[in-house]
Design a protein with these regions (language model features):
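Alpha-helical transmembrane signal-anchor/signal-peptide segments
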Residues: 22-35
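Short hydrophobic/aromatic segments of transmembrane alpha-helices and their interfaces
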Residues: 1-2, 30, 138
Length: 168
């Protein structure tokens, strides 16, 4: 009996304080993550650039968003001709390459500078203790371009596992 209680306590602690399952709702992270896909998040991990994170939707009570971290505190983020620049340095986004090829006219990600986005209130850099996030499906994603910066304190967890092996 004692072993069962210890096992339950350990399972509870892991589930609520370390690793938690989440489900993708919507298409904003296509082609990387798909609607209905099941994921695991690490609740203790500190997000790094290009990590996929989960956070409470600031504009939908009770909902959660899953997005990719693009900008870290102090970063200047800009898109020019479908190319990401952070602090003036060009970054490749291999997770988008197949999607960029499908765009017949225009760009997958429209040109922008942080200070041109109304949602970030003319900020030139990502503020301290905040993140700039984008969905991989740039044409439909409701992300930092529209909802503003995400507080690091609001991050529920970092995605640590996804793929067909987790689909039900």
């Amino acid at each position: 009996m004692k072993v069962i209680i210890i096992a339950l306590v350990v399972a509870f602690a892991i589930r609520y304080f370390l690793i938690s399952p989440v489900t993708v709702y919507g298409d904003s992270m296509d082609p990387t993550l798909h609607d209905g896909e099941h994921l695991f998040i690490n609740k203790l991990s500190t997000p790094k650039r290009f990590d996929i994170i989960v956070f409470p939707a600031p504009d939908e009570k009770g909902a959660e968003y899953i997005k990719r971290v693009i900008g870290l505190p102090g970063d200047k983020v800009e898109y020019k001709k479908d190319t990401l620049y952070i602090n003036g340095k060009k970054y490749d986004e291999p997770y988008l390459e197949g999607e960029k090829e499908k765009v017949a006219n225009g760009y997958l990600t429209n040109n922008f500078k942080l200070e041109d986005l109304p949602a970030v209130k003319n900020a030139k850099v990502v503020p301290k203790n905040h993140l700039f996030v984008l969905g991989d499906n740039r044409r439909i994603s409701k992300d930092s371009r529209y909802i503003g910066f995400i507080s690091e304190d609001d991050v529920i967890g970092k995605v640590i596992s996804f793929g067909s092996s987790l689909k039900r």
